[in-house]
Every structure is written in structure tokens, then in C-alpha cells.
Amino acid sequence: LIKRTAILLIGAVLIISVLASGCTFNVGNPTPSAPTNTYDSAKGFTIKYPSDWTKDVPKSGAISVLFRMPTKNAEENLNVQVWNRSANETLSSRTALTLAAVQDFSNYTEISAGNTTLGGNPAYKVTYTATYGGDHLKFTQIWTIKHGKEYIITYKADPKNFDTYASTAQQMIDSFKIK
């Protein structure tokens, strides 16, 4: 009887120790990793990205680089576009045109918008939800103009995944530098 009580007591102490040590399981909620790799673009910018995000450099089109999040949804990514602009184009004129374009998306709902900086340059940032390509997505877009080029960073994800990767996306945006 004493032996059985001792075994039960030791078992209870072990279970309590494991529970008290803070062992948890993170099922279904991935822990985003910090941006550690650097992408150096021939289009005049650098940006850091996490090693578990897939980098894609399209051979043509507006997107200079696209980083896919480690989710199964191909629409979830952060991408950088670089557009040549005339010398007389300003951030405010591009902002008016860009906002008009995104407001045309189906089910557009603005969450926040305002002036900010990107790579140390005056910029504009907007966060919104909209239906794009048949998918309801949440977006953050930030853009600036420098040396006759417009740099646009777009982070987009399913609204249920958006906040999970938002801090990583913001770290990537904060790492963006124009050469």
C-alpha cells in the first residue's frame, strides 16, 4: 500500500511539474519567423524576408519580387512592384490614382489610411479588405516615389491569416531600402 501511494505521489508530482513548466502545443497557429534573408534587386532596392517564405522573381510583369507566406493559399504574399514614372509625378498625384483604383475593387472597405515613410522617404499607406480574383482578402499597401520610380509594397492575406503574419510583413516593410 505504501509503495502504491509513493508511485501515485511521484506520478502526480511529475504531471504537475510538466504542466507547471509551461509546455504548450501550438497547433494550427504558426509562429511567424523573422526576416533574415536579404533580396537585393537590380531594380534598385533591398528587402529582408523570412527563410520559410518562398521567394519568386517573375521574369516579366509589374511585380519585381513576390514572397509567399508558408500557408497553402497562393494569394497570400508580400510583393514589391517598381514602376517608372515621369519626373513631374508626385506622391500625392500617385496616391490619388492608386486609391481610386483600389476603391474600385469589389466589396472594398478601408480600415486605415495615411502618410508614413518607406525606406526613409515620404510614403502613403492604406489597409483595406476587398474581393480580388474571387477571394476576399485583407491588404496593406504602401508606396513612395524616388528617382522617377514608384515603389509599391503589397501585403495581402485571407483576413483570418492576416494578423498572424502582419508583424513579419511590417518587419519586411521596415527593412525596405532604396539604393
Where on the chain are the PLM-derived regions?
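N-terminal targeting sequences that direct proteins away from the cytosol to non-cytosolic compartments
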Residues: 2-75, 116, 132-136, 146-147, ...
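Conserved polar/disulfide-associated segments of primarily extracytoplasmic proteins
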Residues: 58-152, 157, 161
